[in-house]
Each structure stands twice: as structure tokens, then as C-alpha cells.
Regions:
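An anion/phosphate-binding loop that grips the pyrophosphate of nucleotide cofactors and donors
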Residues: 42
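Two-component/phosphorelay signaling modules centered on CheY-like receiver
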Residues: 19-29
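Amide-donor transfer/coupling interface in amidating biosynthetic enzymes
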Residues: 74, 105-109, 116, 125-232
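Structural alpha-helical scaffold elements that stabilize or flank donor/cofactor-binding regions
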Residues: 38-39, 72
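Extreme N-terminal starter segment of soluble prokaryotic enzymes
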Residues: 2-7
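Structural motif
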Residues: 46-48
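Cysteine-nucleophile active-site neighborhood
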Residues: 51-143
Length: 232
């Protein structure tokens, strides 16, 4: 494979140029697209971190992007989610859900307060809920430490990553306690401990923004490009 073609999935919620530039610096041919067929044909995919859970998943379903992403994942295409992109991998979220459109969570849902819920892509088990604190400011904005699990320390996405490194976060919602621990590569603590890097098969996600996290963030993007090259 030459330079891998990575499509940044455009669900019409923000400027994606910083992600495209970061992937290009990492050695990929990167572009944005909302075309389901272009998404299916990509060597690798990135779902970026802009907007609210409900609005993003609603657009992805209506446009055919959601089915295209799931088809690509089933075919073995590497996928990276950033911030909201990570959250969309999970079974459900409650950000921005109109009260008359959401559903009650089932018995397996998070014990934390939340809902009404909207279904996510369902690639990983668990929920995404709001960070709550009477002492700390929400949203969580700024640099914070990332602590790897043993699985994370051995994962190719984190090759060369320093334990306890500071990465740049900006979010009000995070993965809840009902996530499968086998999918968690790293955690961060802000108002509560939450997974900040996850993996399930050929799907990875970062709650922080690697494209805004200096040299270590760029290393993660470069590692993802290498993963895409290896899958080709």
C-alpha cells in the first residue's frame, strides 16, 4: 500500500480541518466525506469529535453514514473515534436527546443517573453520560493525565506513548461504568474515573483530541496510520 486513504466522516457539525491536517502530517491521504460509498471504500476511517450525541447519530443514520461505517468495520477497516466519535461507538448516550424521543435504559444500562437515551452505533458495550460535579467545572477543558491499562501499554495505537502523559480534553460527557473493561486501554480522572482510550477489534477511540495534543497526540495519529497501512 502507498499512502493510505483515510476518510474523516463528516456529519455536518463542525470544522474538521485540524484532524485532516494531523492525518496528512502522519503520512495519510486524508479527506472529509459524507458519501456512504466513499466511507465504505476507505482504507481507514476517523469519526471526529464535534457536536452532540443525539444530533450526530441522527444525521449519521439518516444519511446512511452509520450503515457505511458499520459495513466498513465488519470488513476489517480500521476506525478511530475522537471525543464524541469515541462516544458514538457505545450502545447509548443521553446528550441532547429530546425528552419525547428518547428511550428508557434497559436493566444492563449504567447505574448512574441519565436518560432519556438514544442508541449509538453499538460497537462497544456501555453508555455515555454527563460529567457531574459541584466542585469542578464542566465541561472538562484542558490538559489531563492518561493512565494506561496493561492492554493499553501493549497496544499498537499507543506505541511510544508515555504513561501519565497529559493530553488535551474538551468534553462534558464520557463513557460510564458499564463499559466492558476488556475494551479499556486507558483511563482519566475528572469528576470520576472514565475510559479515555478504548479498543474493540479494529475500532479505537480517544476521548481527548490527539490532533490538539502536541507531539504525543501526533504520535497516536501516526500509529493509527501505521495500523491502516498494516491492514491494507
Amino acid at each position: 500500500m502507498g499512502e493510505p486513504k483515510i476518510v474523516v466522516v463528516d456529519y455536518h457539525k463542525g470544522n474538521l480541518s485540524s484532524v485532516v491536517r494531523g492525518l496528512a502530517r502522519a503520512g495519510a491521504v486524508a479527506c472529509t466525506s459524507d458519501d456512504p460509498e466513499q466511507i465504505r471504500r476507505a482504507d481507514g476511517l476517523v469519526i471526529p469529535g464535534v457536536g452532540a450525541f443525539y444530533d450526530a447519530i441522527a444525521f449519521m443514520r439518516e444519511s446512511g453514514e452509520a450503515d457505511a461505517v458499520l459495513d466498513a468495520v465488519a470488513a476489517g477497516t480500521p476506525l478511530l473515534g475522537i471525543c464524541l466519535g469515541l462516544q458514538l461507538f457505545f450502545e447509548r448516550g443521553d446528550e441532547g436527546v429530546p425528552a419525547d424521543e428518547g428511550a428508557d435504559a434497559d436493566d444492563d444500562a449504567s447505574e448512574q443517573a441519565g436518560g432519556p437515551w438514544v442508541d449509538g452505533l453499538g460497537i462497544m458495550r456501555g453508555s455515555c453520560t454527563r460529567l457531574e460535579s459541584s466542585r469542578l467545572k464542566v465541561p472538562h477543558v484542558g490538559w489531563d493525565q492518561v493512565h494506561m491499562t496493561p492492554a493499553g501499554a501493549a497496544d499498537p495505537l499507543l506505541a511510544g506513548f508515555a504513561e501519565g502523559a497529559n493530553m488535551y480534553f474538551t468534553h462534558s460527557y464520557a463513557v460510564a461504568d458499564d463499559a466492558d473493561t476488556a475494551d479499556v486501554l486507558a483511563r482519566t480522572h475528572y469528576t470520576r474515573s472514565f475510559p479515555c482510550i478504548v479498543r474493540h477489534g479494529n475500532v479505537w477511540g480517544c476521548q481527548f483530541h490527539p490532533e490538539k495534543s502536541s507531539a504525543l497526540g501526533q504520535r497516536i495519529l501516526k500509529n493509527f496510520v501505521s495500523i491502516v497501512e498494516g491492514a491494507g
